[in-house]
Amino acid sequence: MKDFYYETTYILRADLTEEQVEQAIAKYQTPLTEAGAEVQDTQHRGKRRLAYLINKQREGIYVQINYTGDGSQIAPLERALRLSEEVLRFLTVKQEVRPPAPVAVEA
């Protein structure tokens, strides 16, 4: 079966502590790895102001996960995100081509 490249971005409530955010990131990687996906990269994008109120929240913590899989891994992840009260919104997109690997920049 052919693997495709996916990117899931989700927004966590801004009132979570850094420890709770790290636990949430680990919690949402688990359904992916259990279903056979290979997590390529996880980026904690930080706290940002939302364009409009979502569940009475003005700010959210953005997290992005890039992973490969055959597509069957998306449903368990999105189910976990949908049922969680700490997640405000999420979006999964299928990438057409593999994103380039991040290049280290020398200072």
UniProtKB/Swiss-Prot annotation:
Can you quote a single GO CC term?
cytoplasm
Alphabetical list of CDD domains matching this protein: bS6_chloro_cyano
The answer to whether the entry has keyword Amino-acid biosynthesis is: no
Q: Disulphide bridges in this chain?
A: none
Q: Which InterPro entries match?
A: Ribosomal_bS6, Ribosomal_bS6_CS, Ribosomal_bS6_sf, Ribosomal_S6_plastid/chlpt, Transl_elong_EF1B/ribsomal_bS6
User: Care to name a GO molecular-function term for this sequence?
Assistant: small ribosomal subunit rRNA binding
Alphabetical UniProt keywords: Ribonucleoprotein, Ribosomal protein, RNA-binding, rRNA-binding
Q: Which GO terms describe its biological process?
A: translation
Q: Does the keyword Ribosomal protein apply?
A: yes
Q: Which Pfam family, just one, is annotated for this protein? A: Ribosomal_S6
Concerning its family, UniProt says:
Belongs to the bacterial ribosomal protein bS6 family.
Query: What function is annotated for this protein?
Result: Binds together with bS18 to 16S ribosomal RNA.
Protein name, UniProt field: Small ribosomal subunit protein bS6
Q: Which organism is it from?
A: Synechococcus sp. (strain ATCC 27144 / PCC 6301 / SAUG 1402/1) (Anacystis nidulans)
